[in-house]
């Protein structure tokens, strides 16, 4: 069947949602060859993925993933990656801040692929355990308010696409759909996107998949998160409606900062800067970019009425050491019994 679907794509035609679902299922079952996978990814990238295709692919990923039980108010802060900006792990830092304010965070992430430091890499350097099973993640979510969901553990079937993805080297549909398949089935998210041209398609796909409040953010300086050094394009899905707007740091009560203050060379530097942010001793730009992204997440979570209000809450959590205390709680070792 995959050959017929590849032929359809080669003719410039889009796949239906069900065809996309079938194609992804064939890939994840290990029945597709590396050449077939690379061909499909290349054709989709050249033509541009449709909403139907995105929905079909995400449905297939969700159906095959190892899911964890979580309440509807759980949120994720996750990016597509691939922005090449060499920034420290802002979304991971934001996750720690918002979890310190009582918002449960199921942080979906991986090791570095194109970045200097993936969320798994920096958490290890900080001495924070990466939960090794769904039951451990569920317990961490309940007891500490934050669980790290290491993507390969929950999306084991994606290993079949790993080789072709690495060999072709460019961004593919997998970069876009990864953040949309959180194992906790989060309905509220902040998703960093490497190019804002994809944001409306992703928002429409998530609307059809039942999401409640999602912000797709792209800094105009190329960051796949809210930028402190430039305006940020935001596409918002909220209660079934989709709108686009632009937010500048000044709109959230923050001075414009320097990108150089948030760039790092390796996971060790990223961990050190993240810890300095939590301690309130980092450069102002680093503290403020975390506050800005945490503020967006607090807004998506329904904890704040506006992004600006969320930023004020996040800044207070950092300056009052509430976030630093949460970092220490996350570091504390405890016996987690696997079910």
UniProtKB/Swiss-Prot annotation:
Pfam families linked to this entry: Glycos_trans_3N (PF02885), Glycos_transf_3 (PF00591)
Enzyme class: transferase
Pathway it works in: Amino-acid biosynthesis; L-tryptophan biosynthesis; L-tryptophan from chorismate: step 2/5
GO molecular function, one term: anthranilate phosphoribosyltransferase activity
GO CC annotations, alphabetized: cytosol
Binding positions for 5-phospho-alpha-D-ribose 1-diphosphate per the UniProt entry: 79, 82-83, 87, 89-92, 107-115, 119
Binding site for Mg(2+) 1: 91, 225
Entry keywords, A to Z: Amino-acid biosynthesis, Aromatic amino acid biosynthesis, Glycosyltransferase, Magnesium, Metal-binding, Transferase, Tryptophan biosynthesis
Binding site for anthranilate 2: 165
Cofactor, how bound (note): Binds 2 magnesium ions per monomer.
Domain of life of the organism encoding this protein: Bacteria
NCBIfam families membership: trpD (TIGR01245)
Name assigned to this protein: Anthranilate phosphoribosyltransferase
Species the sequence originates in: Geobacillus kaustophilus (strain HTA426)
Gene giving rise to this polypeptide: trpD
């Amino acid at each position: 069947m995959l050959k017929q679907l590849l032929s359809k794509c080669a003719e410039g035609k889009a796949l239906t949602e069900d065809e996309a679902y079938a194609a992804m299922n064939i890939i994840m079952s290990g029945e597709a060859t590396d050449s077939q996978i690379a061909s499909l990814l290349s054709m989709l990238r050249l033509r541009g993925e449709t909403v139907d295709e995105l929905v079909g692919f995400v449905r297939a990923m969700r159906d095959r993933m190892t899911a964890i039980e979580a309440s509807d108010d759980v949120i994720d802060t996750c990016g597509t990656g691939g922005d090449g900006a060499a920034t420290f792990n802002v979304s991971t830092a934001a996750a720690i801040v918002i979890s310190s304010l009582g918002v449960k965070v199921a942080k979906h992430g991986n090791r570095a692929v194109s970045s200097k430091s993936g969320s798994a890499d920096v958490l290890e350097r900080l001495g924070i355990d990466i939960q090794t099973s769904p039951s451990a993640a569920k317990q961490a979510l309940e007891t500490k308010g934050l669980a790290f969901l290491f993507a390969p553990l929950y999306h084991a079937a994606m290993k079949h696409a790993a080789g072709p993805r690495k060999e072709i080297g460019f961004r593919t549909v997998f970069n876009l759909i990864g953040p949309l398949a959180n194992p906790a089935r989060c309905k509220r998210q902040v998703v960093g996107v490497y190019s804002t041209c994809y944001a409306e398609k992703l928002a429409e796909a998530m609307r059809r998949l039942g999401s409640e409040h999602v912000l797709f953010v792209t800094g105009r300086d190329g960051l796949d998160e809210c930028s402190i050094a430039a305006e940020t394009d935001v596409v918002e899905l909220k209660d079934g409606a989709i709108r686009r707007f632009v937010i500048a740091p000044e709109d959230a009560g923050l001075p414009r900062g320097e990108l150089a203050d948030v760039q790092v060379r390796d996971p060790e530097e990223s961990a050190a800067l993240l810890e300095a942010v939590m301690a309130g001793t980092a450069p102002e730009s680093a503290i403020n970019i975390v506050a800005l992204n945490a503020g967006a997440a607090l807004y998506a979570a329904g904890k704040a009425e506006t992004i600006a209000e969320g930023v004020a809450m996040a800044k207070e959590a950092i300056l009052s050491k509430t976030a630093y205390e949460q970092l220490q709680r996350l570091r504390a070792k405890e016996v987690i019994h696997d079910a």
